[in-house]
Structures are given as structure tokens and as C-alpha cells.
Amino acid sequence: MNTEKSPLISVIVPVYKVEKYLPVCLDSLLAQTYRNFELLLVDDGSPDGCWQIMQQYAAQDSRVRIFRKENGGVSSARNFGLEQARGEYICFVDSDDFVAPRYLEWMYRAMKQTNTELAVCGYRKVSKEADPAGIAPAADEPEIKIFSLEEYYDAPENGELRRAEHAARF
């Protein structure tokens, strides 16, 4: 799904002490079938090699924008990312997570098909040995369900796509 008319999605990744996992996260995001997105990486004062990894990815792909700030916690990093975001839609991904290649495509399509302001997806836990613990099966196509705001009040920051004007501050 790569059309110039597709709206820009801002993917915000707060980064702190995840040197071991960060490349997997970034590779999964840059492999998305939905191509019109910016990837905002916010280094929250990480003392390991995360900043160098972020610089390498930014040098290789113009969609990657990197920022460095004093440690203030994950909420502070997310808020900083929101201030920098230019997209019509906002998505958060934790830096020790990875996503399926059609993640952004499916989330955006679900929002458009149902005319909603928020799309939320499930996830699978993966052990340290990278074996799926399987709380949700992999799918070839997403299953779309519609919930009221009251039914899904506690939507997590990760695993969701929402319009920028509805992006909550933390």
C-alpha cells in the first residue's frame, strides 16, 4: 500500500537501554507495506549504544528522524515525540517490540473501513529465546470488531493507531 495520497502516519518509538532489541524493532517498522510514514526515534538518555544505532538507521532512510533528550521516562519520551510528529495519524511502538509487515496497512485500513478514530490490535508474547508464547494467533487478514469508547476505554498506547488530534499526552 504505497500511494502518494495515503496520509502520513507518525510512528513514535521511545528508546532506552534496548541496544540488543532495537535493530529488530526498526527493521520491522522499515519493512512496512504502508510506506507513507515517518519514524520518530526518541532517545531518552539511554546510556548504551542506542544513539549510534539510531544514527545508522537515520543515515540509511530519510523517513527516520532521531532525537536525543535527558532521561525523563517513557511518558516524557512519548510526549516529546508527539511534539515533533507531522502525521495525520499517530502510532506508538516500544523499542523492544517488533511488528508484522502489514501492521500499519491493516490498522489504517481498519480505521477507514469502519470510519473510526482509533484502531487497536492484539499482540503475541515472544520469549527471550524468540519462541512465540502465543496469546494471539497470527493472521493472514485482520479481524475487525467495533467497540464503543466505553467498552475500550483503557486502550494501550502500543498496538493502536489514532488520528493525531486524538493523541493523548502522557
Language-model segments: which ranges?
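Nucleotide-sugar donor-binding/catalytic module of glycosyltransferases
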Residues: 1-170
